[in-house]
Amino acid sequence: MLLNLSGDSLHTGDATWRRRFFSWLPPSHHFLGLLALVLACAPLGAIAGRPPLVVPTQPGTVLERLPRGYAGLMPTTTVSPRVPSLLQIQALLATAARSGDARLAARADALLSRLPPPDSNAVLRAKAFAAQHRHDFTAALRLLDTALAKDPDDNDGRLARAQIQLVQGRLDLARKDCGALTLGMQIDAGALCLIALTMRRGDEAQAARLVDRLIAQAGADPDLMRYLLATRGEIAARAGDTDADQWFQRSLASAPDDVRTLAAYARYLRARGRNREVLGMLASPPDTDGLQLQRALAAHAAGSADAQQLVASQGRRYALAHAVGTQPEMRDEAEYLLTLRGDATAALELALRNFRQQRDVEDVDILQRAALAAKRPDALAGLQEWARSQHLDLSKSGVARK
């Protein structure tokens, strides 16, 4: 399909999409579906490849050809509504999370700025998701704090805040929010929160039990099931279980282009030296920086004939992002510098910058490896102090290395 920017809004039609996408949740918890998508995929930092920037002179100029399936997000009229629909914005954020396409998150951000005050809690949460997608965690937390100050029983906002705290390495604060959700008998939100917390603590056995319980209760809903299966695959990968393949493959069976699942499965396969399988799986992947990096890393490790070409292409992606003022996913760029360029010093510098705002398992892993390669054990002092404060054992991170 074609993207024409002569209009200023995006439409998703009626509530059919909403009923289908959120059908697994009770009516008061529709927001959880969007939350699971956005928070699971936001760390990917995926930025779609872009052609050279030009300024069009004709209103009918085709700026870019977008992937199949975007038609539902495009304008159905050339007349822009004065106030965009929150449902439209949520659809954009959900699709951006599934596809890794930052263009859609940017569009959602622009539409959010046009909503009239005062912001409802639903709008505050959507703005927080958009902020997290661009890695502005401070703004995201501020928005969620505002929502919870207005309504301490906003369980969706509390779950969102806990997830961001986990990404930033504040397990102590996330534990409080998870506890509040559980004590408040918010079964769905509490379970998702506890799964994320136990995974980050490195308790794969407990996380697996929680996910298995939800899988048994999920019924036939494809969206919830796909999310849970991918999460179960990540847990198995971190634990070194041999059944990780089946979990990832079951998740991909219903959504072969799901960015989050593809990236996690690719990391798992590469960690086990199965690089040729990664190349087969990512032969025609969604065009995101994160998946293209996985492809380049696999080609490099396998000695593939196109490895040099893929590495050069990845470098151009990062150069273009910097040229237009966009910061690529720092841990991915650090991986590129360390593994594909052999520049441990630059990789360590970037990994340290990344660690200031993201402290997930993969963030810790790239920092440790970059410091080791650069012969800079002193660079890990901050990491070690933080791990002690959060009662984490760095020797048992269980990461499926990138």
Residue ranges and their predicted role:
Residues 90, 94, 129, 163, ...:
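Residue-level recognition of tetratricopeptide repeat
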Residues 105-113, 138-146, 171-182, 205-216, ...:
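Alpha-helical repeat scaffolds
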Residues 87, 126, 160, 193-194, ...:
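Canonical tetratricopeptide repeat
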Residues 44-122:
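N-terminal leader/linker segments that initiate helical-solenoid repeat arrays
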Residues 129, 225, 312-345, 352:
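Alpha-helical adaptor scaffolds
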Residues 94, 133, 167-168, 200-201, ...:
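Register position in tetratricopeptide repeats
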Residues 118-119, 152, 185-186, 219, ...:
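Short coil turns that delineate tetratricopeptide repeat
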Residues 83, 90, 122, 156, ...:
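Start-of-helix register in tetratricopeptide repeats
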